[in-house]
A protein has these predicted regions:
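Extracytoplasmic thiol/disulfide redox context detector
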Residues: 1-47, 102, 106-120
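Cysteine-centric redox/oxidoreductase cores and disulfide-bonded domains
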Residues: 42-120
Length: 120
């Protein structure tokens, strides 16, 4: 029911995406009439795809915002070890995350985000 919706397609290995994160977080925290919708668009290889799948899986556990923010503010681009470590740090069930990352619905959602980004 927000007056304005911002849709951000992002990749956890994208420098401009990472650079814009603090500003988007500021908007999310201070603007009541603005809604931010995040769409995964992994374009920088297999680690990007795995990080995107992990973010979707984190959403299934109700911890997307914490996981997303942790990856966006990390000191290095995420690899598999850091993805799982970050998941544990933000309180995710890592074994469930691993299973959900392989779920066909997660893979389908990721494909839908790609198609939506291409249409935008």
């Amino acid at each position: 029911s927000a007056a304005v919706t911002i849709v951000e397609f992002y990749d956890y290995r994208c420098s401009p995406c990472i650079a814009s994160h603090p500003e988007l977080e500021q908007v999310r925290a201070t603007e009541q009439d603005v809604r931010i919708v995040y769409g995964q668009l992994p374009i920088f290889g297999s680690h990007s795809v795995m990080a995107a799948r992990a973010a979707i899986a984190a959403h299934l556990q109700g911890r997307f915002n914490a996981f997303h923010s942790a990856l966006m503010t990390a000191s290095a681009y995420p690899g598999m070890d850091s993805i799982y470590a970050t998941a544990a740090e933000v309180g995710l069930d890592v074994e469930k995350l691993r299973a959900d990352m392989r779920d066909p619905e997660v893979l389908q959602y990721l494909e839908e985000m790609r198609l939506l980004a291409e249409a935008a």
